[in-house]
Amino acid sequence: MKPPPPTRREVVADTLHGVTVADPYRWLEDGDDPEVQQWVADQNRYTRQALDARPDRDAWHERLVALMGLPVVMSAVVRGDRVFTAERLAGADQYVLALRSLDAIASQDSSPAVLFDPALGAADAAVAIDWFEPSPDGTMVALGVSEGGTENSTLQVLVVGPDAGVTVLDDRIPNTRACSVAWEPDGSGFLYTRYPEGDEYHRTVFAHRLGDDPAGDPVVWAEHVTAETWPSVDLSPDGRWVLVHAMVGWSRYDVHVLDRRAPDAGWRDVIAGVEVMSTFSFDAAGTGLIGTTTLDAPKGRVVALPLDGATDPADWTTIVPERDRVLGALTVAGDELLVVATSNAVDSVERWSPDGTLLGAIGDPSGIGVASVVSMSADRTTGRGVIVTVGFDAPFRLWPFSPSSAPESGRHDGKTAGIPPLAVSQVTFPSLDGTTIGMFLIHRADVEPGLDTPTILNGYGGFAIAETPVWSPTIAAWCEQGGLYAIAGLRGGIEHGEEWHDAGRRANKQNVFDDFHAAADWLVATGRTSRERLAIDGRSNGGLLVGAALTQRPDLCAAVSCGVPLLDMIRFPQFLIARLWTDEYGDPDIADEFAWVHAYSPYHHVVEGTAYPATFLWTAEGDTRVDPLHARKMAALLQEASGSIGDRPVLLHQEGRAGHGVGKPVSKKADEQADVMAFFTWQLGIS
């Protein structure tokens, strides 16, 4: 193919902690610069000419549209018999807020009533629901809406009648990105989190009464440890106690309580200043806290404590001790506790009594299968609720449940659009330092992977996010066509507890890259694929992962998909919300931590003349998490360094009216992934 569009190179360098750091494409950082916008247009045109010419792109797009058009339930919140869901209806571009009943779900008759559709009255499909929170009695819902993938929500309030009729109130509160909402028991208002105008940090808890001007809402909590402190808020069922979890970095939650009957006493620390993760809910009576903590238990334990008593962790009562499973979300369901327990990257839901007796598990005799729990909610009084799970072969499953004294109800499965049977297995292999790493292998059941099998290796490895089973139209489509899809459970995630996370963050980040390299090497060494048939794929922190892989091991694979990536690890904290991530990666302003990130920063390890794998970088102009400048700068540098050697192109696509991924309409997702699939089949020599 012809050479990429030319890119102006400048002599720009900084001296940081005694090290000279070159940055020849810094001018590409300013996305509002007309020259940069023209450069992006030229790059997009070059990429479109290459990918639109691929003979299989239209077929990929058609199948992805069909798979992405399947109904999907993303989350469910129970209030009495009402179940509020964020779900995408068949063929829809965006998620809607819908209403079901527990009885209807249990009887498999669960066609939802749509309460709010962001597409109605919208100019295009880029208007999305970001989050929602129903009131305790289920008659009102606060929800956040944003445009263009920005996730910069404006809070709105719906009143939901007995017949599911909806009235939209006049209340509008901007700057409520990823908002935490705690309704007053009587529904007169709520506590919520909001950002100062024009500020990406200093998230603060306010109180709002319906009908009031939010500009006058009083501050409830603003005791930030740092500007990046991330509070969430909850209220006890009687409204007496305010509970704030303040995330400080990615391995610490400080927890505080306030007694509204004695406000002069001020906030009391439940736990603070300790590098542990503790998340609490109010118990069934509303007089105590119950939750999970990694204090003295890296895999987690369930503890309880009274609200009006001592909060010394030494006095906490352990209900579920640390075991070989990683404990995650906890839900109070009447007289029971539901706890998500993860073993070898597969979730189960355990039922416990408050005295620490294991009562059983949710699901069929085999549990919920090879699946992930994406949502779990119950009515605090009746104990009835619903769990939402996903799997490699299931867009969603709804599992209604009742207290253990009542009979179990069946599950409600999402449709699968004729996907052939898939074989899912888990394997292990040693990393560079001998650590055992796990990996999912997914392929069509009648396929035996071999040297000619086109294979995609995906990973993430960061922010205590576990690589558990997912529903992915891309995986389903790839496997349908005879491909192998591998997902590596790298250090930096939470697959095996907080110690696993710590082993892949800050000074230990290179472990993540070593794990990923070892996964690729294992796939080749065991004959499941070959270098020529291997592609690697990652997005966001996973984009950093594959960026490090292509610069550290250019021999690793034939093709790379690098989506919405972090790649300049020296300047990353200067843009958007990225200072939130210095606790995970390190802060380049600190000499020792600069050394950590400079050692692997992909943008700073591109070597001229190296035959890098074919690389497709894709990003979006509305991304408010990872600035698209990373992909722009890396594309320019790779194109210049390798000259898009031979048949190994370096392509860049920057999507308009889209963001990091949340709120991206199906039409844009199908375009994005059809591009990736067509790029891979081209570079793996199978189209």
Language-model region placement:
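A flexible loop/linker signature enriched in serine peptidases of the S9 family
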Residues: 88-95, 121-126, 145-154, 173-177, ...
